[in-house]
Regions:
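ATP/NTP phosphate-donor binding region
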Residues: 2-94, 104, 339, 346-347
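Glycine-rich beta-strand-to-loop/alpha-helix junction loops that act as flexible
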Residues: 41, 97-99, 124-126, 237
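Catalytic core of DAGKc-family lipid kinases
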Residues: 42, 55, 62-64, 73, ...
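Short glycine/serine/threonine-rich phosphate/pyrophosphate-binding segments
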Residues: 79, 101-106, 131-132
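Glycine-rich phosphate/pyrophosphate-binding beta-alpha loops
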Residues: 179, 183, 234-247, 315
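Short acidic/glycine-rich loop or secondary-structure boundary segments that cap or lie
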Residues: 183-186, 228-229, 241-244, 268-272
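A generic structural signal for short beta-strands and their flanking turns/coil linkers
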Residues: 215-217, 229-231, 254-259, 293-295
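ATP/nucleoside-binding phosphotransfer catalytic cores, i.e., glycine-rich phosphate-binding loops
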Residues: 247, 252, 262-347
Length: 347
């Protein structure tokens, strides 16, 4: 049997040990694993300084039976192509090291695989926001995260799928959070050179500019027999939103639902007044703020004002857009303290 064929056979064994309802599955250290480590050297502020940490992490992973080959991205979209190649090669595991954008690219490569081989995903934090790392309680230091992963288990989780109604070819999977309104505008308008220099502060700077010039147009949010005209919607798969903020705090990565949050106001000053409530996690119950859960949501413009959307902090398209849950769309390697999480089965 060729080595590549053996990898495919072993991967099938790994998948069969992971349950289909999202319950705890196969320990990663049960067999020797052939992994691909996808590193974005431009993510965060690490650059070349991150390479020795990755070498240390690879040694740690090897002690747990995970042999990780390191591949670096060279530009936008590269991580998606590399992840797709990993599925074709029959890899046992893909490890992403980069920011939320890198992670989103890898997710789109794995979830979009055409050969039916579902390769589990793992994460080593390397970006500015690291939303998923926070959600999984992973240390932000790369070797520390590697130590957690070798004792983790593979879980089936749902993904969000965002489809622009007028440009369905631009559909994208997302793992953490999507949104439409001012956050989409900020993501579209942020200075990428500034982001490379100062990280997440670039979004704060762009947000301050948008408060002064954005029109906050209303659009319609339709989900679970609820229809609300809003200036912002957050479509959460995770509790963490970005930076220090948690918005959709009842969201559960292991549940087949979004938590939605909408704001009605069209006033930039009112948005600023929400900041203390956001900082202290007191948005629930605030006038004009709505939370509820759904497995699909449609956002439609009400006039000619463009409303932009983002997924996992990356620009998507203008409304109208449909966001929907796709159960068991991804296999995720989670640390032990998340692996025993109790999951409510969703039909």
């Amino acid at each position: 049997m060729e080595l590549r064929d053996k990898h495919r056979a072993d991967a099938k064994v790994l998948e069969s040990n992971s349950t289909e309802d999202g319950q705890p599955g196969s320990p990663m250290n049960s067999n020797q694993q052939n992994a691909l480590l996808i590193h974005n050297p431009n993510a965060g502020n690490g650059g070349k300084a991150r390479r020795p940490l990755l070498d240390e992490a690879r040694k740690i992973l090897a002690t747990g039976g995970i042999e990780a080959e390191l591949v670096e991205t060279r530009g936008p979209g590269d991580a998606t192509e590399i992840a797709q190649r990993a599925t074709n090669e029959g890899r046992h595991l893909v490890i992403a090291c980069g920011g939320d954008g890198t992670l989103n690219e890898v997710v789109n490569g794995l979830a979009g695989a055409q050969n039916g081989h579902r390769v589990p995903l793992a994460l080593l934090p390397g970006g500015t926001a690291n939303i998923l790392a926070k959600e999984l309680n992973l240390p932000w230091d790369i070797p520390g995260a590697a130590k957690k992963l070798i004792h983790g288990e593979v879980r089936d989780i749902a993904l969000g799928l965002a489809t622009p109604v007028n440009e369905p070819e631009k559909k994208r999977w997302f793992l953490s959070v999507a949104g439409a309104g001012p956050d989409g505008m900020i993501v579209y308008a942020v200075d990428l050179d500034l982001k490379a220099r100062v990280g997440i502060l670039a979004y704060w700077w762009q947000g301050a500019r948008e408060v002064l010039r954005y029109k906050f147009p209303h659009f319609r949010v339709i989900a679970d027999n609820v229809s609300i005209d809003s200036s912002l919607v957050v479509v959460g798969r995770t509790k963490n939103y970005g930076g220090p903020f948690k918005i959709t705090t009842d969201a559960d990565l292991f549940e087949d639902k979004f938590e939605l949050m909408t704001l009605e106001t069209q006033s930039g000053l009112r948005y600023l007044s929400y900041l203390p409530s956001l900082w202290f996690n007191k948005l629930r119950g605030t006038d004009g703020v709505h939370f509820w859960k759904a497995d699909s949501v449609v956002c439609e413009p009400l006039d000619s004002n463009p409303v932009y959307a983002q997924v996992d902090g990356e620009p998507l398209a203008r409304l109208p857009i449909e966001f929907k849950i796709v159960p068991r769309a991804l296999k995720l390697l989670v640390p032990q303290d998340n692996a025993t999480h109790k999951v409510r089965a969703v039909a």
